[in-house]
């Protein structure tokens, strides 16, 4: 089995884009049909990229710190630099960050993107199911994160193909030791504190998938040598997600 390597957007994610993913392995093309590649432009006119995932035909879930201008979502992609017949590129009609999102502390880091048109469901494009309100993950559970980005710390270019890595759910105390703002109520701690392999600038907004359900959203970390990282806990925000998808 290949080693579990860095895949997350976790180094300074609230001030950076999602250009880098370290390690992991390339997945079978279109085997993660819920994955979304989000393009946008920041206030300085620079292109920014984030991950996300389809939760309904016209809604994508991502991280609130990914909010920018001129946002578009690409669904059904494996190679984001190729013009694949499976790809569906849809502009974002409205970005809905959580009203209590705190950029400085990285709390309530979750956002819904209302698409201008509904995605067409195909083998390469399908929503990812959300967990039930009483569902929980526990320390030791193995989950996965996927995204596009660099395959090594020294790489100068990002991988165009979708990659994935496995992470282990950690005790909340592991993240609380690193970040005083960490909340076990609204966040999940995942990685492997025994390995210098996880947090690094990469795919913000992508899903933490456990048992084929979206339990978390990639939020933040500390640097390229410290793990674990922090994920927004989807279960806590289910009422907010449901309410906003019904309103629009």
Curated annotation (Swiss-Prot):
Propeptide feature: residues: 19-20
Cellular component aspect of the GO annotation: cytolytic granule
Alphabetized InterPro entries for the sequence: Peptidase_S1_PA, Peptidase_S1_PA_chymotrypsin, Peptidase_S1A, Trypsin_dom, TRYPSIN_HIS, TRYPSIN_SER
Enzyme Commission (EC) number: 3.4.21.-
Residues bearing carbohydrate: 68, 154, 223
GO biological process: killing of cells of another organism; proteolysis
A Gene Ontology molecular function term of the record: serine-type endopeptidase activity
Cellular compartment(s): Cytolytic granule
Domain Peptidase S1 residue range list: 21-246
Predominant location category: other
Disulphide-bonded residues: 50-66, 143-210, 175-189
Active-site feature positions: 65 (charge relay system), 109 (charge relay system), 204 (charge relay system)
Stretch forming the signal peptide: 1-18
Keywords: Cytolysis, Disulfide bond, Glycoprotein, Hydrolase, Lysosome, Protease, Serine protease, Signal, Zymogen
Gene3D superfamilies (alphabetical): Trypsin-like serine proteases
Protein task: This enzyme is probably necessary for target cell lysis in cell-mediated immune responses.
Family (UniProt): Belongs to the peptidase S1 family. Granzyme subfamily.
The name this protein goes by in its record: Granzyme G
Species of origin: Mus musculus
Organism lineage string: Eukaryota, Metazoa, Chordata, Craniata, Vertebrata
Gene: Gzmg
